[in-house]
Amino acid sequence: MKPAARRKARELAVQAVYSWQMSKNPLDQIELSIVTSNNMQDVDTEYFLELLRAVVRRTAELDAKIKPYLGRLPEELDPVENAILRLATYELVERIDVPYKVVINEAIELAKSFGAEESHKFVNGVLDKAIKTLRKHELS
């Protein structure tokens, strides 16, 4: 699958996770809303669904993995930053086939697109600390 299709999958996944965080609507309802309101032709749909379902299913586990690197309480996170960090944490932990530099770069781009003005700096800082533990095998 082309990198652009993966990027679009991540964009839609962040939007869907954000929607789920804010509304707590059932996952299948959120999936349907995203899929029917977007042109999925240029999206790695399988990757989108994997990211969304895994992040929603494993929220507590992902939050626990990223919490030591936040520098603030998880409940103080901006909901967009939270969605991006959950998604990136899942990729760092489970998608070893995706290089950590790609995960971080994609998360920064998502934060620039959807987050507040300084979100990308915060996301970068958190993930830069997290990779030292979550992807230490790639750093040596």
Curated annotation (Swiss-Prot):
Keyword Amino-acid biosynthesis: no
Pfam families associated with the record: NusB (PF01029)
Transport keyword on record: no
One Gene Ontology term from the biological process aspect of the record: DNA-templated transcription termination
Record's signal peptide: none
Classification via NCBIfam families: nusB (TIGR01951)
Protein name, UniProt field: Transcription antitermination protein NusB
Species in which this protein is naturally found: Pseudoalteromonas atlantica (strain T6c / ATCC BAA-1087)
Gene: nusB
